[in-house]
Amino acid sequence: MDLCSSTGRGACLSPASTSRPCPAPVHLRGRRLAFSPAQPAGRRHLPVLSSAAVPAPLPNGGNDESFAQKLANFPNAFWKFLRPHTIRGTILGTTAVTAKVLMENPGCIDWALLPKALLGLVALLCGNGYIVGINQIYDVDIDVVNKPFLPVASGELSPALAWGLCLSLAAAGAGIVAANFGNLITSLYTFGLFLGTVYSVPPLRLKQYAVPAFMIIATVRGFLLNFGVYSATRAALGLPFEWSPAVSFITVFVTLFATVIAITKDLPDVEGDQANNISTFATRMGVRNVALLAIGLLMANYLGAIALALTYSTAFNVPLMAGAHAILAATLALRTLKLHAASYSREAVASFYRWIWNLFYAEYALLPFL
């Protein structure tokens, strides 16, 4: 049996008088274990354990600190979960359509209706959050490749928490609409939630088919939002429903614009979509061809707006409608040259997609004054 000696340089002595280095102290569950010094010759003792002072472990293995950190990070993760660019589009679209109705009927303005209008906006944001959230839950394997910054793909939000948020948003939105806006708007709202569900959720999961996918996005973002907000606003003001030229224009324009968004959003995601057998226009036709198709559709949208203003000069603010869309068309042409110069790289098409949303916002900013 080897005995550790405290003399010399910590050698261990054996009966054969050979020496070797002492074993390093052992650590066990935060405690440092060391052998006690040997006693004088002739007396032999078993090793005893001594404890050295070490920092106490965090309660619950550090889980309290982890929970506190997750709690502090939740607002940022939740904001990313809501997809801010879609939130901005919903807010701007709702505000613009409502403002247009009020500007056309200034005598009907009643500030007592403002709380109801804000409730309607909250309901739309809840529906928006549900649709983009459910998509992240079922797209997590794709987003790990295409969009690793999203909170479900990055692990900032667990699937269980994401589910809880989605169901809460859907229930809150549907409850607000049912309690405040009547059967027609409630039906339109639940239909929008249904389309958002079948877009992402198996067994239908229509996003894997190019044509149904863009039709759903165009319907929800283009028709349902504009028609629903316009109808609800006129009903709240006590006005019968009738299409105005400007709102008819924006509904058609944004529906086509939403089609452009639907096919360009997949341009940076070709790698992940191909790996998960998702069929998009980009995977079938190629990034360059789809980008040029989207640009062509958007350019046709602008040229159509200019032609409409010149043809129906009494229905629109011609200088603004024709002039603004001519400027936006020229801006699109310049941006197309930049995209072409970048050879339609993944970074370039991702930047182009983000930039297209600025054109979308600009259209709604123009609406009240057309």
UniProtKB/Swiss-Prot annotation:
It is found in: Plastid, Chloroplast membrane. The keyword Membrane applies. It is an enzyme of class 2 (transferase). Inhibited by haloxydine (3,5-dichloro-2,6-difluoro-4-haloxypyridine). Its EC number is 2.5.1.117. The chain crosses the membrane at residues 117-137, 159-179, 184-204, 209-229, 243-263, 290-310, 314-334. Its cofactor is Mg(2+); Mn(2+). It catalyses: all-trans-nonaprenyl diphosphate + homogentisate + H(+) = 2-methyl-6-(all-trans-nonaprenyl)benzene-1,4-diol + CO2 + diphosphate. PANTHER family: HOMOGENTISATE SOLANESYLTRANSFERASE, CHLOROPLASTIC (PTHR43009:SF10). Involved in the synthesis of plastoquinone-9. Can use both homogentisic acid and 2,5-dihydroxyphenylacetic acid gamma-lactone as prenyl acceptors, and solanesyl diphosphate > farnesyl diphosphate > geranylgeranyl diphosphate >> phytyl diphosphate as prenyl donors. Do not catalyze the decardoxylation of homogentisate uncoupled from prenylation. Belongs to the UbiA prenyltransferase family. This is Homogentisate solanesyltransferase, chloroplastic. The lineage of its organism: Eukaryota, Viridiplantae, Chlorophyta, core chlorophytes, Chlorophyceae.
